[in-house]
């Protein structure tokens, strides 16, 4: 141990009979000698080999502990304590391991302190870097009434000019509770700030059995207290992560930034007030969260709601998942989010252009109450069980005025959709309703689309499953040139007038996309014998292989006069005979199909669209027998398909389908004459198709349960085919044809959305006219192509084209 001094002689202690011999020994020391551990305007260094002692520093002394260990250190005035790879252990009856006062300075690097670090006001400075502070209950003084890790407090003389500062830089602090009895504000406290400022940064961790950080102004003139937590963690046990006790009028500025974490044992990130606070002390608490995600409540106890303010600001992608209780002002901006986990109340709510307030997560429904609201383009997110007027929903209640503009997003929380009257109340305004709230994205429930309306009578904002119609211009201004006056002698008596305030419910286009997919699924595998045989149904020698490509576009009638459906189908079929019998009259074979459908459902009312997609394939077998006049055919197929529905602004929905489809077909050909070298035949045909489809029950991302209805049943086709047969100059057989078909569908397609059925208005009767030609070459190759148009009930239209190639050997 090295010791130096500039003191001429030690100050003699007061004599006492019991210590007389000790005093005589001290008096005999040479001038300039100092007791080890007691520094007065002196410097000392403690190394690893030096004895473990307690130290006291005054009058600008300096103590350096480099790799060594000491007991209690007390430093005052302008003294400096440097700890480097050192250890300080509380001993004896001392409450703390290190006690600083006046303008003393403590700098610790990579050191361990067993016991509290106490700062007794003044302009003291503490910097703990990469160090450890541990307050272990087992090592506390018997009968101790406090356990605090780092304590910036006031015990002695106070001056309003004093601003002690504490920096925890990459430092770990752990504080236990007293075994008995634990106290609310003096035991298990990670850090206490009564005066001055504290920075907890660079990965520091403060773990406390009670409160993580406690701020309490002890004096009327304590000034502003500042706590900054940057890239660090503050964890509490039985108390709040941060507690403010407003004993006297003070300002508290608290910032949590740069990915910091607050882990609140009692669920409160920040609590202002509670036991021990002094009634009547006006307090301003400013809580800023900057680029950090926190989970817990921010609370101003009701006793202080009228005697202080708690102001919360979220900035720079910050997020709080929790409640705001009695918050005076909340500002949400800078891509920040407040996700409410329960009912909350705020005095002045300001929502910036990139801020979001989510009133809940859909598990429960919450109410946010604000005295005033100012919107600057941010977003309010509501969870609503979309149904009728009585639907459960998150709600914003503004007791005073609402100004500015904000967007509203609505997520369906399992609502089945229903017709509304006045609507589902989202926003209630008690004062001047000057704010504009715009629905962002879409609100859908069941088969219905919802829209946001401002009610003219109360200024509130409601969701309605209806679309406001444009007013009649002649009602607005009867003097317009196009407005003819009604003859008062012969007035028009309108029948079943439509209430313009409450029009009918609006269907969402996704409902049409589901129906279009169902229609396509039923049609994708349908075919007849001539589709496989390249247009021929007569007996022929040899084994035949074939391939066919076709494409069809269908336009279905409007669903409920709102949704217009277009379905484009295409497929590739391949097959080959595997057996031929009865001199070529009979044959059996196998086939495969790859098919897809793309559908569009468009709402003329809203302008929204949805797209449907069906993709898949099938394997099947067939068998037929034919003569030059009669043919009979049977086939069976098993298919599996993947379905998708994608609506504007909504998540993509996926579900699967499978089906069995079987067919029986027969026809008989009559010779009716000849034109030149071309023989004419007329052939009536009859086909029965049975479809057994199974589509998964699907739950959408918004909670709507979608189920197929009536997608299995028997359908039929009756046709009449006029065909000519002749030969070209090259010797090929050319057979032009014209076919008229009548299709009758037995199944009534439909889908249920949360058990509310909706039919696609697919026509039961369709009428087709198809024309084409088949060419048989001498080489055994044949080819055919055709084009057809179809009309059906309710304005259904369809066009189809096909190309087939077959080869026999």
Task: Please annotate each region the language model reported.
Residues 156, 228, 263, 271-273, ...:
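Membrane translocator/pore-forming domains, dominated by Gram-negative outer-membrane beta-barrels
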Residues 34-78, 82-83, 478-481, 485, ...:
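N-terminal segments that cap or nucleate solenoid repeat domains
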Residues 51-52, 70, 74, 280-285, ...:
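Extracellular beta-solenoid/beta-roll
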Residues 39-41, 45-51, 58, 62-70, ...:
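Beta-strand-rich solenoid/repeat architectures in extracellular/passenger domains
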Residues 56-61, 74-81, 94-106, 116-127, ...:
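Right-handed parallel beta-helix/beta-solenoid
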Residues 153-155, 214, 218-235, 240-245, ...:
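Glycine- and acidic/polar-rich repeat regions and solenoidal domains
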Residues 2-36, 623:
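Gram-negative bacterial Sec-dependent N-terminal signal peptides
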Residues 4-7, 392, 409-584, 657:
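Outer-membrane translocation/initiation segment of Type V secreted surface proteins
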């Amino acid at each position: 141990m090295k010791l130096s001094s500039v003191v001429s002689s030690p100050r003699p202690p007061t004599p006492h009979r019991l210590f007389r011999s000790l005093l005589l020994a001290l008096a005999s020391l040479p001038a300039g000698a100092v007791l080890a551990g007691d520094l007065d305007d002196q410097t000392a260094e403690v190394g690893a080999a030096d004895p473990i002692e307690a130290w006291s520093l005054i009058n600008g002394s300096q103590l350096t502990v480099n790799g060594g260990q000491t007991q209690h250190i007390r430093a005052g005035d302008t003294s400096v304590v440097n700890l480097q790879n050192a250890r300080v252990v509380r001993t004896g009856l001392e409450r703390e391991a290190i006690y600083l006062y006046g303008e003393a300075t403590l700098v610790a690097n990579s050191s361990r302190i067993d016991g509290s670090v106490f700062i007794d006001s003044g302009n003291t400075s503490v910097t703990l870097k990469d160090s450890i502070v541990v307050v272990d209950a087992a090592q506390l003084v018997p009968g101790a009434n406090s356990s605090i890790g780092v304590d910036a407090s006031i015990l002695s003389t106070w001056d309003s000019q004093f601003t002690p500062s504490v920096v925890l830089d990459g430092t770990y602090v752990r504080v236990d509770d007293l075994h008995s009895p634990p106290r609310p504000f003096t035991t298990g406290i990670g850090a206490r700030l009564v005066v001055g400022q504290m920075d907890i940064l660079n990965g520091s961790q403060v773990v406390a059995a009670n409160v993580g950080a406690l701020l309490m102004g002890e004096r009327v003139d304590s000034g502003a207290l500042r706590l900054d937590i940057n890239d660090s963690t503050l964890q509490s046990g039985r108390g709040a992560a941060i507690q403010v006790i407003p004993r006297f009028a003070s300002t508290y500025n608290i910032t949590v930034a740069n990915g910091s974490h607050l882990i609140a044992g009692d669920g409160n990130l920040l609590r202002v007030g509670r036991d021990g606070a002094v009634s009547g002390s006006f307090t301003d608490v400013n809580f800023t969260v900057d680029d950090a995600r926190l989970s817990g409540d921010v609370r101003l106890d009701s006793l202080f709601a009228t005697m202080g303010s708690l102001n919360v600001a979220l900035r720079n992608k910050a997020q709080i998942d929790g409640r705001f209780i009695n918050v005076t002002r909340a500002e949400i901006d800078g891509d920040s989010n407040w996700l409410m986990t329960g009912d909350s109340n705020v005095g002045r709510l300001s929502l910036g252009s990139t801020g979001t307030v989510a009133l809940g997560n859909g598990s429960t429904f919450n109410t946010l109450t604000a005295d005033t609201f100012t919107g600057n383009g941010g977003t309010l997110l509501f969870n609503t069980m979309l149904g009728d007027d009585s639907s459960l929903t998150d709600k914003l209640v503004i007791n005073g005025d609402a100004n500015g503009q904000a967007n509203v997003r609505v997520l369906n929380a399992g609502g089945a959709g229903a017709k509304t009257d006045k609507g589902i109340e989202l926003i209630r305004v008690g004062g001047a309703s000057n704010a504009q709230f715009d629905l962002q994205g879409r609100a859908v429930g069941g088969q219905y689309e919802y829209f946001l309306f401002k009610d003219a009578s109360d200024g509130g904002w409601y969701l309605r499953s209806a679309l406001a119609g444009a007013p009649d211009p002649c009602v607005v201004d009867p003097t317009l040139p196009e407005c003819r006056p009604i003859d008062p002698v012969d007035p028009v008596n309108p029948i079943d007038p439509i209430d313009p305030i409450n029009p009918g419910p609006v269907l969402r286009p996704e409902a049409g996309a589901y129906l279009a997919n169902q229609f396509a699924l039923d049609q994708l595998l349908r075919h007849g014998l001539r589709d496989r045989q390249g247009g021929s149904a007569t007996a022929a020698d040899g084994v035949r292989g074939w391939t066919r490509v076709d494409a069809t576009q269908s336009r279905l009638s409007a669903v409920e006069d709102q949704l217009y459906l277009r379905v484009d189908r295409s497929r590739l079929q391949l097959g080959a005979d595997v057996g031929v019998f009865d001199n070529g009259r009979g044959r059996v074979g196998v086939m495969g199909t790859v098919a897809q459908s793309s559908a569009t459902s468009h709402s003329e009312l809203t302008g929204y669209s949805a797209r449907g997609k069906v993709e898949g394939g099938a394997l099947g077998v067939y068998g037929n027998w034919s003569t030059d006049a009669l043919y009979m055919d049977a086939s069976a197929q098993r298919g599996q398909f993947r379905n998708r529905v994608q609506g504007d602004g909504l998540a993509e929905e996926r579900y699967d389908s499978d089906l069995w489809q079987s067919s029986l077909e027969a026809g008989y050909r009559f010779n009716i004459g000849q034109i030149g070298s071309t023989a004419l035949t007329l052939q009536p045909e009859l086909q029965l198709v049975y479809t057994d489809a199974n589509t998964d029950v699907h739950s959408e991302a918004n909670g709507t349960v979608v189920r197929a209805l009536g997608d299995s049943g028997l359908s039929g086709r009756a046709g009449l085919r006029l065909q000519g047969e002749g030969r070209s100059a090259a010797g090929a057989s050319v057979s032009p044809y014209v076919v008229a078909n009548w299709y009758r569908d037995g199944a009534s397609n439909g889908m249920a959305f949360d058990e509310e059925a909706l039919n696609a208005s697919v026509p039961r009767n369709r009428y087709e006219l198809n024309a084409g030609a088949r060419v048989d070459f001498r080489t055994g190759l044949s080819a055919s192509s055709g084009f057809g148009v179809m009309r059906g009930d309710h304005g259904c239209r369809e066009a189809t084209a096909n190309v087939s190639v077959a080869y026999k050997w």
